[in-house]
Regions:
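Alpha-helical transmembrane segments and immediately membrane-proximal extracytoplasmic
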Residues: 1-268, 276-507
Length: 507
């Protein structure tokens, strides 16, 4: 009798996943696109592969927390339909808010959105006593429920800022500010590759894929495997450092010639009076409005955004500049860290869209509310379903948040991006292993602040205060908007038909 809720919940959860793609996936790729290590097209392709992979292989931990760690399931044992309907409302309101926030370039927290929705739904149906406000845990941070999640909202940006500033400060001191930074980078590149691979391999191995038993990997085994993989990566890269060095030098030698050629081409275009309208008119008829919209989004001119905004242009102009050749070394490293960040993002944030739908699906399948019920093999297609939604969201609307974080918040270069992405990935995967649904937005913003603050520690002139304030305001509004709208929508569906009935009398 609740099949319609399963179908509607699936649709709304897919929309919520699209909203996450439009808003939160930019957290993984904004720095790479902003530093021009990746194009928007490349970011979309990588997101499609690694967001979905992270969700399917590693997302079950956090999905369980979103699904079972906020609301007390025992309160719903006698009313499974209400929990299903309430979870559907959570998905609908989360998706709605994420698209609104993306429209106004507010990188909000999807974790805030989902948790706030679950709280609002539970309080309306069963009261505040059925919300798990506090729960003692045996592992760090030893606090579960809503209290543990709220604590993570403070800890995650703080830790991300500390780690990213430490990473970038070390890189800047040892390499970037050296007179022979290019040579130093050449010598240290295998070590940097090995270190990056080791860190990411450790957290991926230690967290593991639950379906194949890697989530039980002991700490010492994870350390041994990750160190071995990192060392092997450094050894493999070492023979190619000479070729990489030659390619970078050749690339920068010919860059001036390319710029001259582009100028001549632009002059010819102007002389021939060829404008955008002429070009658009020559497109094939099969290119419909949706294709054109997507194409415009992934080909947006990022340089124009910087030039047209006075404050953003000042931040970019005043930022410390390092050798172009040295920065080029960090591009390949940044792409790798972006992939790891994307992988961890898929593991963490797909749960925000799929957690409530997982509750709907299990209740409908088992015909009862039982906290011990697991998704089993169904987790893979459900998490994959969410990963695909995230990719579509990035494709349709992700450029908005990429502009806000990757360009407008501060100046991002490949070396800065490596520190930001690596710090964010470490905090996110650690939290996911501990079954804490961290805010990816908080981690990314915190890591970005940590790097940008090093430009001028006293005045923080490397940060765009207006963007930062708008972001914080968005975080506050998230709890109010999603929690309130979910409560209203849930109340309308659960209580309106039964005013004066048994359900109201029982509450």
């Amino acid at each position: 009798m609740y099949t319609w809720i399963v179908i509607a919940g699936g649709v709304f959860s897919f929309i919520a996943a699209m909203g996450i793609g439009a808003n939160d996936v930019a957290n993984a790729y904004a720095t790479s696109v902003g530093s021009k290590a990746l194009t928007m097209k490349q970011a979309v392709v990588l997101a499609c592969v690694f967001e979905t992979s992270g969700a399917v292989l590693m997302g079950s931990h956090v999905t369980n927390t979103i699904r079972k760690g906020i609301a007390d399931y025992e309160c719903f044992e006698d009313d499974p339909g209400a929990l299903m309907y309430g979870s559907m409302c959570v998905c609908a309101c989360v998706g709605m808010w994420l698209f609104i926030a993306s429209r106004y370039e507010m990188p909000v927290s999807t974790t805030h959105s989902c948790v706030g929705g679950m709280i609002g739904m539970t309080m309306v149906i069963k009261g505040s006593d059925c919300v798990i406000w506090y729960q003692a845990k045996d592992t760090f941070p030893y606090i579960g429920g809503v209290s543990g999640i709220v604590l993570s909202w403070i800890i995650s940006p703080l830790f991300s800022a500390i780690i990213s500033s430490s990473f970038f400060g070390t890189i800047r001191f040892l390499i970037l500010r050296s007179k022979n930074s290019f040579n130093r980078t050449t010598y240290l590149f295998p070590i940097m590759i090995g270190t990056t691979v080791t860190l990411n391999a450790f957290f991926i191995t230690f967290k593991g894929a639950k379906g194949i038993g890697l989530d039980d990997t002991p700490f010492n085994v994870a350390c041994a495997w990750s160190f071995g993989i990192g060392t092997l990566s450094a050894v493999i890269v070492y023979p190619f450092t000479g070729a990489i060095r030659t390619r970078i030098m050749s690339k920068n030698t010919t860059s001036i010639e390319v710029e001259h050629m582009e100028c001549k081409i632009n002059d010819n275009i102007n002389d021939d009076n060829i404008n955008d309208d002429n070009i658009k008119n020559k497109k094939p008829v099969c290119c419909n409005d949706l294709v054109k919209y997507i194409n415009d989004n992934i080909n947006v001119n990022l340089d124009t955004i910087v030039e047209n905004n006075t404050k953003v242009n000042e931040i970019h102009e005043d930022a410390e500049v390092f050798a172009i050749e040295t920065e080029d070394y960090f591009k390949s490293l940044q792409v790798f860290t972006a992939i790891c960040d994307s992988f961890s993002h898929g593991a963490n944030d797909v749960a925000n869209a799929i957690g409530p739908f997982a509750a709907i699906y299990i209740i409908n399948r088992e015909q009862q509310v039982n906290k011990s019920n697991e998704l089993g093999s169904d987790a893979y297609w459900i998490l994959g379903f969410g990963g695909i939604g995230i990719t579509f969201g990035l494709l349709l609307y992700g450029y908005k948040i990429i502009q806000a974080i990757g360009l407008k918040l501060c100046k991002i270069t490949p070396s800065r991006g490596v520190a930001i992405e690596l710090a964010s990935a470490i905090v996110i995967i650690t939290g996911s292993r501990l079954e804490i649904p961290l805010s990816t937005t908080h981690c990314q913003i915190g890591a970005t602040i940590g790097v940008a603050a090093l430009e001028d520690p006293r005045n923080c002139s490397g940060l765009n205060a207006s963007i930062l304030i708008k972001t914080v305001v968005g975080w506050v509004l998230t709890l109010i908007v999603v929690g309130g709208s979910t409560a209203l929508l849930t109340a309308q569906g659960v209580y309106s038909p039964e005013i004066g009935g048994n359900k109201c009398d029982n509450q």
